[in-house]
């Protein structure tokens, strides 16, 4: 199987979500850790933690969409890397913001990257070639790998 950055990042980010959850969980019983549960610092760490899961899932969904719809061309490549950049920079920005709240403009990088990736993917899905649409609507036998139902 050819290396795909979105698939790799998806599962690596999900793993990091588990690991960061474990690390945060070591300290959650301390009411005053990072300024207490409602503190800005602690909220940013929680946001970084959950972004690993959410953006890992987004990259996995992009990879699955690219496989199912056969996304190709330069816009598909830009969308792919936009999701990777957004996923990598979001938890980094959360960590920086936890300690330097005035650096909030850093969030422009992950937010714009993710919006770009989402907009390009939606555009590509809406304008998928007719030959691919015909293959995808041919019936249940069009994609044997995704089917788990037993045929009668």
Give the label of every model feature segment:
Residues 1-49, 53-152:
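Polytopic transmembrane helical bundles with strong interfacial aromatic enrichment
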